[in-house]
Amino acid sequence: MNPFHDLEPGPDVPEVVYAIIEIPKGSRNKYELDKKTGLLKLDRVLYSPFFYPVDYGIIPRTWYEDDDPFDIMVIMREPVYPLTIIEARPIGLFKMIDSGDKDYKVLAVPVEDPYFKDWKDIDDVPKAFLDEIAHFFKRYKELQGKEIIVEGWEGAEAAKREILRAIEMYKEKFGKKE
């Protein structure tokens, strides 16, 4: 089984999507799901003394403008193991440009954690935490000499629109998967 191609994007898209976690919160290792094999590979170790502030992964059967699956960040109280599948509720959209490519990311919370039951939109997330995430992405490739432009945050509706668009982009690239 290849989780990228064989899982649906979610049980109730775009309200609830599957997040396949590649990188646990607190890691300096950047793992990526290999699109061909479905195995996890080490892409690189971050050059900076930074660590991922959230669990980070992809939404299956999506594709985005950076020529990769659509990224998703899941706010968890404890880090989860790579390749964990989380039913996640999109609450926001982080907008950034990475080396000239649009590289937007969904921000989500786990459906099955009562701690986040009232988090429905970006305004429910403490601003200080959003600032930490933005700071991480602004600086994490700096020592590699790559430029990141942070455009800011949008709410849940923008995230849901981009998820639906990323599903259509997947279908265009890989053909409709039944």
Swiss-Prot record:
Question: Where primarily located?
Answer: cytoplasm
Report keywords, A-Z: Cytoplasm, Hydrolase, Magnesium, Metal-binding
Residues binding Mg(2+) 2, per UniProt = 71
Q: Which Pfam families match?
A: Pyrophosphatase
Q: Name one GO biological process term.
A: phosphate-containing compound metabolic process
Binding of Mg(2+) 1 occurs at: 66, 71, 103
User: What's one GO-annotated cellular component?
Assistant: cytoplasm
Q: Give the binding site residues for substrate.
A: 30, 44, 56, 140
Essential cofactor(s):
Mg(2+)
State whether it acts alone or in a complex, and with which partners, per the record: Homohexamer.
User: In which family does this protein belong, per the annotation?
Assistant: Belongs to the PPase family.
Q: Which HAMAP family match?
A: Inorganic_PPase
Indicate what this protein is called per its UniProt record: Inorganic pyrophosphatase
The species is Pyrococcus furiosus (strain ATCC 43587 / DSM 3638 / JCM 8422 / Vc1)
Q: What is the lineage of its organism?
A: Archaea, Methanobacteriati, Methanobacteriota, Thermococci, Thermococcales
Encoding gene (name): ppa
